Amino acid sequence: MRNTVQGKDGFGLGDGFMKPGQELVMAGYTGFSGTLLIGERKREILGKHFAPGFLRSLEEGERFSTEQWMKHELEAGNSPVTAYKFAGEGGVFAALWNLPGVFHAGIDVELRRFPVKQITVEFCELFGLNPYRLYSGNCLLMAAEGGGALVRRLRREGIPAEVVGWVTEGLGRQVGHGG
């Protein structure tokens, strides 16, 4: 399976593929790792704008690991995932740019389909940040056959997931806002 690995020489290639018609699945909450960091570093400012109960939701953290899930998938050897990219730095926008770039593939995605927590939206509005560019360390973009079935599997394992788009012909990257 081919993934994108950021190393000292840029992105490396492994086995795998992306082809038109495949679905793009996002697992994990968009920007939530960055939200947790903001919560740690800006607690005093946040306390002036949000109720304590709302901020306590940060204490739950992330109860799942997309990295561990993907590791298990690779070990099992029967995954519908043919290519993947952990979002991390640069957020889901970076993953949307980098993954199809490795395969010279196009994509068509809808931002409103991405799993995102309300607390992330609120923090981004307060600090003028873009949730799709916010650090997304526990977020995974995957190309797969049968994306709907993959989403159901992920959800059964407690990982939020959605089909967010499709692989298309050509090199274009269409990003819609669902409006």
Positions of predicted regions on the chain:
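Helix-biased detector of long, well-ordered alpha-helical tracts
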Residues: 1-179
